[in-house]
Curated annotation (Swiss-Prot):
Gene Ontology cellular component terms for the protein in this record: chloroplast
Location of this chain's protein in the cell: Plastid, Chloroplast
InterPro entries found in the cross-reference section: Uncharacterised_Ycf23
Family: Belongs to the ycf23 family.
Name used for this protein in its record: Uncharacterized protein ycf23
Species in which this protein is naturally found: Pyropia yezoensis (Susabi-nori)
Lineage top rank: taxon: Eukaryota
Keyword terms, alphabetized: Chloroplast, Plastid
Length: 273
């Protein structure tokens, strides 16, 4: 497994920030604004749609590392040939809204096909939140075994939770942080937390085992580069401020549902040994 050198340091230091423009977002003006803001504010890398025209436009005006998201090996191979070195199978929200769901088997097939065709390219795979924790852990371990470099967790999508208030944001971030914690306790693969992430919730993601956080919806609501820059700075400041805070989170989750599920999973695994 190899993480591209231009993002590896931030992942190793567990302070990486990914700005996500959206798998189905082809609004070039907004994407260029987000790109400019990401570069000014020092985001680690940018995640864009698998569109060759957008890739060429961004690469011609920016030096920020680019990742593309898609759900087929063919699209990812095409983008890699266009010079993209970070590929992701994921960003499923647009598909959830259409009633399209992804099984562990389908994710494995896409991932294996992509990895076989592109053995040296950094590959990230999003774990669907619709899977139970036990399935998410098993899928992560299987993906790691075939050489996937990074895992991304997600929270409940907007099609499952339409709340736009603080409650809805916390619900999404709690879901992705729970998955991050469970997976980090059962694998050593770098993890991105990427749902409901804000200045409030980003430090929690790192406490729960993330190496990177992904931000998208909140930054897309802003309508100018200056506001986007300030938002990314706010996220990075929150992360940096909390990096020196050493906290033992085990006491707060010892009796939680997620911990009970992990205990049950461990017992199940032991019974099969």
């Amino acid at each position: 497994m190899t993480i591209s050198s231009n993002i590896a340091t931030d992942f190793t230091d567990k302070q990486a920030v990914k700005v996500i423009t959206g798998l189905n977002n082809f609004k070039i003006q907004q994407i260029k604004q987000m790109t400019q803001a990401s570069e000014i504010a020092g985001a680690t890398y940018l995640d864009i749609a698998a569109d060759i025209n957008i890739i060429e436009e961004i690469r011609s005006t920016s030096t920020i590392p680019i990742c593309v998201s898609a759900i087929t090996a063919e699209e990812l191979v095409h983008c890699q040939q266009a010079g993209v070195q970070i590929l992701e199978i994921g960003n499923y929200d647009a598909f959830y809204e259409q009633g399209r769901l992804f099984s562990s088997r389908e994710i494995m097939e896409i991932s294996q096909n992509t990895r076989e065709r592109l053995p040296e390219t950094t590959l990230c795979v999003t774990i669907p939140h619709i899977l139970c924790i036990e399935e998410q852990i098993k899928l992560t371990q299987d993906l790691q075994n075939i050489g996937v470099d990074i895992i991304q967790t997600e929270g409940k999508s907007t099609s499952f939770s339409k709340q736009g208030d603080l409650s809805g944001i916390i619900q999404k971030s709690a879901s992705t942080c729970s998955s991050t914690y469970a997976i980090s306790k059962n694998s050593n693969i770098p993890i991105i937390s990427a749902s409901g992430i804000s200045a409030l919730t980003s430090p929690i993601s790192f406490l729960y085992g993330a190496s990177c956080i992904g931000i998208s919806t909140n930054i897309k609501r802003l309508n100018n580069v200056a506001s986007m820059v300030m938002y990314i700075y706010e996220i990075k400041t929150a992360i940096e401020y909390n990096r020196g805070v050493k906290k033992d989170i085990n006491h707060s989750i010892r009796k939680s549902i997620i911990n009970c599920q992990l205990g049950y999973y461990d017992l199940r695994m032991e019974s099969h040994v």
